[in-house]
Structure formats: C-alpha cells, structure tokens
C-alpha cells in the first residue's frame, strides 16, 4: 500500500470514530435531518475505506477478486450517496427554515416523512433510473473502490449530475434567507428559543453555520464535476441502442496511484461536523466516555493499567451522574415544599368572605 493509501486509512477511520459521539448527541436530540446526513456520510466513508484497502496495490499485474457481489451493492450505494448527501443537508436547511418562520415550537418528528423521502427515497429513485444506462456492472479503481459506469448522455447529465447542483444551490438560497430572517427577528427568536426545549439559540446557530459551510464547499464541487465530465467526453444523445447494450462490456480494473476526490469528501464532512459540534459543552465528555468504554471493552487492554484507569474514570462518571441526579431530586422536593408553604401562607393571610370563618374567629375575641 502506498503512503497516501495508508494516510487515507487513518484519515477515514478516525473520522468514523469521531462520528460516534455526534450520532449519540443527535439521537438524544432526535434531529432527523442530521441523522440522515450522518447515515450517508458514515456509510459511504465505510465503503470507501474498506474497498481502498482491498484494492490497494497499484503495481499488481492481476487481481484475484473483482468484487463480484460486493461491488454490485456498494457501487449502487455510492450512486445513491451522490444524491443522498446533498439532499439530507438540504433537509437540514428546510428544518431550520421551518423553525425560524414559526411562532411556536415545532412538534417532535414533525415533517419527518418528507425528510426521509427527500433523503432516502429520491436517491433510490434516481439510482433506479440510472441502472438502464450502465455500460457494465461496475468498474474497479485501485485505491478507490467500485463505481458504477454510465454512458455519458444528456439523460445522465439531467438526472445524475444536475440534481446535486440544484440541491446545493437551493441550500445556499435557504441559508441566506435564514440569515436575513434571523437578523430581523433576533429579539423575537430569543424568546422563542427559551420556550423551545428541543432547540436553543446556540444549537440553531451551530446547525446554520454547519449548513452554510457545507454548501459553500459542496456547490463548487458539483459544478466542477459537471464541467470535468463534460470536458472528458461529449454527452451523447439518448437512444434505445444504449439501453440494449446494457452490461455488454466486461468489468474493468484501473490501476491508479492516488485517492480520488470523491473518497475524501465524506470523511472531510465528518471532520467538519465534529469541529462544529465540539463547541457544545458535553461533546468532549461524550468522546472521553466512549474512549474509556472502548478501552474497558477491548480484551487486550481490559486487564492492563490503562484498562483499570479507564474503569476508574467510568466509575467516577457514574458516581457524578448519580450525585447530580440526587441533587436534582432534592432541589425539586425543596421547590415543591416551598410551593406548599407558599399556598398555606396565602390561604392564612388572605381574608375569606365565608361567614363561618368569621363566626369561628369571633369566639376568640
């Protein structure tokens, strides 16, 4: 394996490790758009890093396995991810736009069907529409993995290359509109976020900045992909002969000495998400908790000094959580007692109009 391949292995796997606390945070927050974006990013990163390790020797004259069965599935997942990643980021912007235009907090899981359809169903439909234009089952690129191979037609341009551009451009439009609305309604939104238990002002701005940086980087990338594919070969007119020639070409293996641009995008976005979510207070604690749990779980570190230290840290975290929970219960009990005393004091201090109470009071005069 070349040095660039070794570096990519560490780069991608560390991005997957950093995505675990983000996934935990978003599951607790029940943020469906972020979970959909994490789904596509982690799945494609895992596919890229595994396949780049399988076909890692560019100087091999022949390869023993052409990926039969595995590449039939992963190549189509990669095709779906080219639409699913910008679509799920677009649903995140739609969610923020819905929040900022409402005068009351959103209901939990509101519009989740629309988000799932746009992020999952739309990529599956586009992938199914592109299957008849496959020149062969897939191609295997060394240090990159398996990719679908399409005939370059105007049909491919319209249904495969243009949708990511439109989704990225729409995301930039909604981001700019959200920024304008937030600037105009800043005072009203501060009161709104105080009423909403699921979304605070910091969380809203964090998600907005994440979406803005994502689309500012992803939109030029989609334009570059369209221009690059257009320069490499001309787009042919669509005809039935191309459909009849489906899978007529054999599976091709391309030896290369570099990792393609597509393989770097998903792990880089995971690093970007980790950077933004690391500004939250509990992110570092969650990362440390996951790492300590991993050291305790691994058999070759469980009985070592490092494993015992990790177990000590986990026990300390559990004791702190139980102490904080006890203090919370004590504070709630104290508040309830104060409310009861306040009600009793108000009843005794406010005179009543009941004549029986006046008669009882006259006995002691």
From Swiss-Prot:
Keywords assigned: G-protein coupled receptor, Membrane, Pheromone response, Receptor, Transducer, Transmembrane, Transmembrane helix
Domain of life: Eukaryota
Sample GO molecular function, one term: mating-type factor pheromone receptor activity
Function: Receptor for the peptide pheromone M-factor, a mating factor of S.pombe. Pheromone signaling is essential for initiation of meiosis in S.pombe; M-factor signaling alone may be sufficient.
Any GO CC annotation of this UniProt entry: plasma membrane
Gene: map3
Family from the record: Belongs to the G-protein coupled receptor 4 family.
Mode of membrane association: Multi-pass membrane protein
Official protein name in the record: Pheromone M-factor receptor
Location (main, coarse): membrane
One biological process term in Gene Ontology: positive regulation of meiotic cell cycle
Stated induction or repression of this protein's expression: By at least 3 types of regulation: the mating-type of the cell, nutritional conditions and pheromone signaling.
């Amino acid at each position: 394996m070349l040095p660039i391949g070794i570096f990519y292995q560490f780069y991608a796997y560390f991005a997957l490790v950093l995505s675990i606390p983000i996934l935990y945070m978003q599951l607790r927050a029940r943020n469906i758009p972020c979970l959909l974006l994490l789904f596509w990013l982690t799945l494609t990163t895992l596919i890229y890093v595994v396949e780049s390790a399988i076909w890692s020797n560019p100087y091999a004259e022949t390869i023993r396995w052409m990926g039969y069965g595995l590449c039939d599935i992963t190549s189509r997942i990669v095709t779906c991810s080219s639409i699913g990643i910008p679509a799920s980021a677009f649903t995140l912007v739609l969610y923020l736009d819905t929040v900022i235009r409402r005068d009351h907090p959103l209901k939990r899981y509101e519009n989740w069907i629309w988000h799932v359809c746009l992020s999952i169903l739309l990529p599956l439909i586009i992938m199914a529409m592109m299957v008849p234009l496959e020149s062969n089952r897939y191609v295997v690129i060394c240090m990159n993995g398996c990719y679908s191979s399409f005939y370059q037609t105007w049909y491919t341009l319209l249904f495969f290359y243009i949708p990511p551009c439109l989704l990225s451009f729409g995301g930039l439009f909604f981001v700019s509109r959200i920024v304008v609305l937030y600037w105009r309604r800043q005072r009203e939104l501060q009161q709104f976020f105080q009423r909403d238990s699921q979304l605070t002002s910091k969380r809203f701005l964090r998600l907005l900045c994440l979406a803005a940086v994502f689309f500012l980087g992803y939109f030029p990338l989609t334009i570059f992909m369209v221009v690059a594919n257009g320069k490499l070969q001309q787009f042919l007119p669509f005809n039935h002969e191309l459909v009849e020639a489906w899978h007529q070409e054999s599976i091709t293996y391309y030896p290369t000495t570099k990792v393609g641009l597509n393989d770097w995008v998903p792990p880089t976005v995971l690093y970007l998400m980790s950077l933004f979510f690391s500004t939250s207070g509990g992110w570092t604690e969650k990362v440390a908790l996951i790492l300590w749990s991993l050291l305790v779980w691994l058999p070759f570190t469980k009985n070592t000094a490092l494993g015992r230290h990790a177990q000590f840290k986990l026990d300390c975290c559990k004791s702190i959580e139980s102490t904080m929970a006890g203090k919370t219960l004590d504070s709630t009990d104290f508040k309830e007692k104060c409310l009861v005393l306040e009600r009793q004091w108000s009843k005794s201090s406010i005179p009543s109009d009941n004549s029986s109470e006046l008669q009882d009071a006259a006995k002691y005069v």
